[in-house]
Amino acid sequence: MAKGLVASGRRAPAWPKDALRIGFGIIWLIDAVLKWLPGFRSGYMDTIMGIRDGQPGGLRWWFDFWVNLQHPRAMFFAYLVAAVETLIAVALIIGFARKLTYSAAIVFSLLIWATAEGFGGPYTSGSSDIGTAIIYAVVFAGLLILSYYAGPARYSADYYLEKKISWWWRIAELRRPVPAEAPAQAEIPAPASLVPQPADGAAADGGVSRQLTK
């Protein structure tokens, strides 16, 4: 069965996978808007330091590194987080550089999970989940795998950029898109009037020859 076709032989619609990407982008956009509020910036460093205080001794060095790195420039990192989340959200919604966006978002989500969320804190008393950022990373990985099998997204900026820029697929797709094949045209038989007919003289000669051989 050809790829992209359902069991009935009809091509699977493109909009469900694009709707998933856009819906997830809207969730990220809401989260990004909250990051631009003053409350996030004012409590940013307190959150990082609070996460460090509850970590076991074997992980203390990891959180000390991030606290020491960000503490002198906490406002810069707070704005950086808000900007990165905004860029990811916009790229998701419009479908821009999907392979690059998904890959960068996986790394960013894992970094948030390993710092601001303290690996979800499954080893701390009273922990009830492993954090949300790791779930975001899994969703981005799913979108990346889906793009590999589904190919170019019809409702995305990448779809049109790939037509204009020959190398754009390298940052938008996991593999080079296969050019669409032109539909095969059925062979139409020529009308009988156009089929060459033997000349009358040749037909007569053939008849005489057959009579002489008898």
Segments and roles (model prediction):
Residues 1-84, 94-214:
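Extended, low-polarity transmembrane helix blocks
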